[in-house]
Amino acid sequence: LAKVKLAHDLKRGEVLEIVVESLANGGDGVGKVAGLPVFIDRAAVGDKLKVRLFDVRKDFARGAIEAIIEPSKERAQPPCKHFEVCGGCQWQHINYSAQAAHKEGLVRQALKHIGGQGDNDVVIEPIADAAGGGELHYRNKAQFPVQYVDGQYLAGYYGRGSHSLINVTECSIQPPAMDQVLDTCRQLLKKYKVHAYDEAKHKGLVRHINLRQSFADGKLLATFVVNHEAQKYSKFKDNQDLVVMLDVARDLVDAHKNIEGVVLNFNPEKGNRILGDDSLVLVGIEYVEEVLKTKRADMPQKLREGLKLRLSSSSFFQVNSVQAVALLEIVADMAKSALADCAAPVVVDAYAGVGTIALWLSPFVHSVVAVEENKDAVSDGRANSLLNDLTNVEFVEGRVEEALSRLMTEGTLPDLLVVDPPRKGLSPEVLAAIKEHGPRHVIYVSCNPTTLARDLKLLSDKGEKGESNGYKAKRIKPVDLFPQTYHVESVVILERF
């Protein structure tokens, strides 16, 4: 194969002085050398750096900081002792007000460069940030891979740009109680000589330790993901590989009185999927209960008293309980505006998870249909409807790709569609269904500015004959649910044109 001719003379190993001009989606700082963008991990805008290039391509290069010549005014002291090696956070070295501003900028950049929309095309409102105490210890869920290395049980996060595991003993974005429970888990695996999973050989038992904590009462749920076929409890005690986990579970609950339950999740498959489809409760119950409460006087009394949510180990729920309320308030405001002329509004909530958005909107509307494919999340959602005495929410188990067209063409047509897809965004099937059958208004909740911008562009495209069957984004509100990282949520209200 012929070598690609480079339009520059940069070489791997070369050391350059670079001034960081911006931050990219992914967290890297970006500076330019002869017009070529250079991506630099752990950089801040305004840094003057000595950078060693380790990856040089035709259109970009990557470099590592050799020295900080002049630090940016945005730099801050990272609160976590693992930050320099851990891949969990990207922006702890940047002060929080600057983090929030850059996240808003990432949304603008994506809309402009991918979605083709400038400031004159859509209103991008100031970000709803977590300033005032919500910048640290906010995570209500964490998933820790487990390895056995040099006689030591490791559980934590993968290192920066690697598959090596960092044994996290203190994490500044999760509650201290999680640190304590994780440490006990490591000790118990060692005590009972439980084999950690070896991904390369597909051998060993414990793959992950997952922890979920309620911010309402501090209770925790611990889940051990094991490399084993699903077992019923009747056969469980005859299996020597698994019965040891019952001892681990009992000791864990004895050591931490705030643990509500210990669950075994079975995942015998190769690959990087974390959870399997089947679980077994070893001790206690299979869920914790969260309460989301608004302080706004203009919200319904039920939401001021608090929306109760049952969360099992595998159910999707926002990882930041406090900022989830801010996001839900924004969704409700947009929904009220969109439905102002509807006498008995009907809402479809796609990718509903445990029903957080559906249940939050239920006091404002006549009825909500929540679509979710995860059976455990649907079970939690139905339980949450009963828990909150909400009788106008129906849960439909199934893939959004298959259920959405049917729901929007049969029976009572929805007045509003809410979509909250995973990071990969909306599939072509869902985009087509929305354009063909969707209601006048759509609210799009996104956790990825890149796929959001792509989908907004696709939803705004006119038909092959130029017919107007698309949607225009009217307002976008970024929300920070992930301080110390580059991740940012956005809530968008779209209207048919």
Residue ranges and their predicted role:
Residues 124-134, 199-200, 207-212, 477-481:
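Short, solvent-exposed loop/turn elements at beta->coil junctions and helix N-caps
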